[in-house]
Amino acid sequence: MAPFIPSSHTAIIQHDDAGGVKITPGLPLPVLEPGQVLVKTAAVALNPCDFKMPQRFSQAGTYNGCDYAGTVVQLTEEVEKNGLLKVGDRIFAACVGNNPHDKDSGSFAEYLKGTAKFCWKIPDWMSFEEAAGLSGTCIATACMSLFQSLKLPGTFEEPATKPLDVLIWGGASSVGTTMIQMVKLLGHRAITTCSPKNFELVKSYGADAVFDYRSPTCAADIKKLTRNSLKYVVDPFSDLRTMALADEAMGRSGGKYVALESYQDTHDKKSKLIERELIMGQMILGRAIKLPGDYGKPENPEMGRWGVECYKSVQRLVDDRKLRPHPLRILDGGLEAILDGLEMLKRREVAAEKIVVRL
């Protein structure tokens, strides 16, 4: 029997051009484009971008939220023909939420639209909450950073035979533990920073070496460990302090620095040897990102084709239990709990955990 699909639903959307969001009932269901599916949302995960993006790129009526897990309830004709998904499939992925050019794209909703070729099927043994917690946003960001920006040798199927050192700043964050796992799966050494209380946590995800980011000798200690040869850095924070420390830890010949936030270059002598790049997870889709400043990106169909193959590789990792979510803090309460969780993130009350909300 076909699943019941209502004529309207409730979602969290921006209610003004100042970045405020609120729960809004009576909204029409998302309009599906070719290749998309309608998903009944079961769980969502929260990211800092979920409160930052409405503040930076505000436009009334735009849906909020990225990471989700749920059940497919409707297919477009293209998906019916290609057979990528079927009604009843449990899937997880990430929407491009807070998108002023695709306003009803967002996961903080009773129903959402997902692109079939950029979704993963949830194994029978995995819960919706765990799947949402794997975070499509973190996975896409990690893949873009490690493969497309750093261009590390090796694949998940055929890891590198000569390990390289990769510094992941902030390893106790959800993107940090995702990066650590993927660096190890690619056959490389994962070096990271965090608070001493989280040393054992990041080691449990595979970190080979971990340093206290507050230590006055942090960068020097990393440089000593890597014998002044570190060439690869990923920095989720990308502020002047973390950039300066990353530069100091980098080897004598410089290297590649991946920023996950818009950054201001230090323009010191060392920085001339360092190539910097801003990476966002949604770049993996190959679509144009129509945002101002550094966040704007042109359409890249070749990237999108690579992204599809990358998602297939990640599906195999998930199926083989080689990728696990960040420690979860699960909240009940539906959309109201999402708003509570966003406030917790704003107040920096969440550390070394991923907030997941059941809908």
UniProtKB/Swiss-Prot annotation:
Disulfide bonds: none annotated. The gene is RAP1. One of its GO terms (molecular function) is nucleotide binding. PANTHER family: HYPOTHETICAL OXIDOREDUCTASE (EUROFUNG), TRANS-ENOYL REDUCTASE STHE. Belongs to the zinc-containing alcohol dehydrogenase family. This is Trans-enoyl reductase RAP1. Pathway: Secondary metabolite biosynthesis. Trans-enoyl reductase; part of the gene cluster that mediates the biosynthesis of a tyrosine-derived cytochalasan acting as a fungal signal recognized by resistant rice plants and leads to avirulence in Pi33 resistant rice cultivars. The first step in the pathway is catalyzed by the hybrid PKS-NRPS ACE1, assisted by the enoyl reductase RAP1, that are responsible for fusion of the tyrosine precursor and the polyketide backbone. Substrate binds at T137, C138, I139, A140, T141, A142, C143, M144, G281, Q282, M283, I284, L285. Its EC number is 1.-.-.-.
